[in-house]
Amino acid sequence: RAHLSNASTDAAKKSILNRIITRVLDDGTACSIGIDERNEANFLTGLSDGIIIVEGDDDKNTGIGLRVDYGYLSEHSFGVVTTGEVTGDDIERVISKANDDGNSISVIMLALSTYNKMRQSQWAKELAANYQGQTFNNDTKLPVPTSTLFDEAFSDQYNGISFLKIDRSVTYEKNGRRVSYKPWNANKLIFLPSADNVGSFVWGTLAEATNPVNGVEYTTVDEYKLISRYSKTDP
């Protein structure tokens, strides 16, 4: 309404109205964004959990799902000594295993909430204090290090390893209701040799691409998204 009222001529108002109608009825773009969101959610869930269910029978979908197992090895999966807390000893066990196997860790991916909780722990405070050359004892009340200080101290202690903090929310819609959630499992830390390439994004040709259904309009977006729109005209 604001756009229409600001138009100076009837032709301008008509042009703006046509653009608004086109935008509202542009199902292809809306679906494309939804596919991007689902891909992002699957990526983050799969990387943190090692398993995803594509369009499955979970709390966000109905019907039969496709279970994808990333094949994380049990000997490469570690727990923590104290439930709900990540310590330097927990991290060192993973790094030591990687080194023994001839692998190197450069990045640790984790939820921002988990990172902040870890930064407030006693071992993180002591790590930052040691990095700054500060002397302390068991009675010293050390401050919580800033993110910058903790990252620098951690990188210095663990041969350049850095943190990649995840705080991504994804919005999905079901039965006309939009809900946001965070697909990364906050209970998981993933140790990677590099954050530049953690896998490949591949796709194939769908059956409908070569055998379209009558009465269905198809649109291909970004080379791999086949979006269909069905319409019916009653007499």
Residue ranges: model-predicted function:
Residues R1-D69, A98-S113, P235:
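Long, contiguous amphipathic alpha-helices that act as assembly "spine/axial" helices in icosahedral shell
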Residues T9, D26, I33-D36, E40, ...:
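Generic surface-pattern signal
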Residues D10-K13, G84, P143, S147:
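Intrinsic-disorder-associated interaction segments
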Residues I16-R19, D90-R93, L149:
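Exposed alpha-helical structural elements
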Residues T22, S48-D49, N61-Y70, E75, ...:
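Intrinsically disordered, low-complexity regions
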Residues L47, I53, K60-T62, V68, ...:
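Generic detector of intrinsically disordered, low-complexity, polar/charged segments
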Residues K60-D139:
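Extended, solvent-exposed, turn-rich assembly/linker loops in the middle of proteins
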Residues G79, K125-P235:
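Sequence/fold signature of self-assembling virion shell proteins
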